[in-house]
């Protein structure tokens, strides 16, 4: 596949070091492990069942090496909407949750200006109210707080919580705010988590209130992602929290319409790669700091 693209794009003076295992990698060259049959069909600028199958093979292969500590981090390049979807597990986040036997997993959008987690992932809007429960909000607040401390070295994270209903903007809380969101926030504060809210999403972002917080917890994906990208899309990437391994991904769409024209922007993938590297360093620092603690 790589050779095909190199030929189509007419890339000269560039060679790939084909290896079989991560330990064979040459630090001075671009290394590649071929996970699929060399005869796999390539349709330039198209997502096909064959490409989706090859994507899942590569993902499983990389995770196997990650689990064996043969690589340190995993960064996913832009993919089509069905690339990481399986009938057995569902979406990528659901697949990773089942692979590592954990339900406490969450996509966190990360940029230089804002970090955002979600109570629900990319589910149908009609299913959102059923998933916005005290238990789920508390679990996500706990996970977000732990992640900010361990993976981003923020000692006392301050987390803003968005409301579910628009009338929060008028100082009026709906049933979900009164009976679900506020009790979850109060429980989190009892556990030492600095959670504040609920805030109206419109007012929160229009008045730039996010600048006063280390992270934001949105109730559902569409509530937060558009505002997040309007604040800072240039430095953005996605981090998948709650896993024993480090996994990040680009927020950039694959843009199949410009494939082969040398018009793509690599910044989104670069952001995801640097994010994974930063988290890796932070985890190592935390491990080192927790060694040989002084007695009380």
Task: Give the positions of each predicted feature.
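Anion-binding alpha/beta catalytic cores of soluble intermediary-metabolism enzymes, centered on
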Residues: 1-296
């Amino acid at each position: 596949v790589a050779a095909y693209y190199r030929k189509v794009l007419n890339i000269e003076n560039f060679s790939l070091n084909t290896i079989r295992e991560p330990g064979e990698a040459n630090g001075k060259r671009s290394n590649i492990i071929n996970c699929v049959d060399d005869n796999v069909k390539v349709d330039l600028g198209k997502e096909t069942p064959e490409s989706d199958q090859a994507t899942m093979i590569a993902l499983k292969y990389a995770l196997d090496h990650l689990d064996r500590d043969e690589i340190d981090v995993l960064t996913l390049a832009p993919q089509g909407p069905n690339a990481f979807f399986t009938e057995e597990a569902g979406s990528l986040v659901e697949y990773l949750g089942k692979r590592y036997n954990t339900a406490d997993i969450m996509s966190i959008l990360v940029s230089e200006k804002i970090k955002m987690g979600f109570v629900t992932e990319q589910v149908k809007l009609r299913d959102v109210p059923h998933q916005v429960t005290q238990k789920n909000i508390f679990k996500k607040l706990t996970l977000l707080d732990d992640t900010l401390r361990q993976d981003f070295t923020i000692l006392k994270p301050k987390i803003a919580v968005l409301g579910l209903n628009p009338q929060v903007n008028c100082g009026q809380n709906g049933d979900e705010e009164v009976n679900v969101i506020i009790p979850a926030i109060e429980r989190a504060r009892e556990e030492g988590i600095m959670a504040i809210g609920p805030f109206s999403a419109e007012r929160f972002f229009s008045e730039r209130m996010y600048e006063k917080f280390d992270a934001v917890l949105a109730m559902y994906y569409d509530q937060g992602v558009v505002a997040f990208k309007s604040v800072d899309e240039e430095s953005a990437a996605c981090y998948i929290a709650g896993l024993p391994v480090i996994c990040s991904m680009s927020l950039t769409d694959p843009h199949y319409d410009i494939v082969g024209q040398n018009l793509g922007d690599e910044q989104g993938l670069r952001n995801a790669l640097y994010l994974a590297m930063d988290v890796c360093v932070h985890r190592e620092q935390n491990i080192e700091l927790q060694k040989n603690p002084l007695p009380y």
